């Protein structure tokens, strides 16, 4: 009998089964070296990637929730595999998403949180894109950002903040919540940010633009046509949100943690150890308040002495 510790992570197991692990590892490495990606659609449309997307969608309990077209993963299961792959490829070639069905979920404070439910076919398309974009973006993201990233949950963010406080003897935490962040993302700015981190496949960017502009059917039956924002509930939305906030992450780090000491060389001791006392002194002389930043989605935690 296999114990819990012996079980391999299901995500990794699926990647190996569909022979995509090496491809995604290469995307991550190339992105870290600054490669420009202008031909990603063949990877997104590959049979292996589409089949993996189906597997990932199917194992999510939300796959049994229907969108505007009333279809669920059970309807997709009835389609022969070859035909399924062909349908997804055609949708990616001429992508026109169906309207997103909006529902309102009660929050602990009594307010309602809007949640968008895309049609099941659109969820599969978004999953195909996510699987290829995620390793590229991961190589660009700061290690201070958490939430909807591999091995970077809320628990990781809390542990990271706690470690900074213990290591640097910091006693105050400032919490910043970007109000209405998901509903106010500028579409043009987002596409530009994707371009700047190396995602320069024009056809793919057009697909993402169409996804962002998908009509939203409200609970009362009215339809709105969004000019900004990333729909909460969309599979690709968390990644796109992290792309938007990536510039902020690196700006804060550059201003408070790197800028004062960027011209200061580390001192190497006789034993070969690296002593960063000079960098610390340079920071003290800069007049900036010592701090560390940890972000979870649109929540930013800043620790101070």
Predicted region positions:
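Amphipathic alpha-helical blocks
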Residues: 75-97
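Conserved phosphate-binding loops in nucleotide/dinucleotide-binding enzymes
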Residues: 114-119
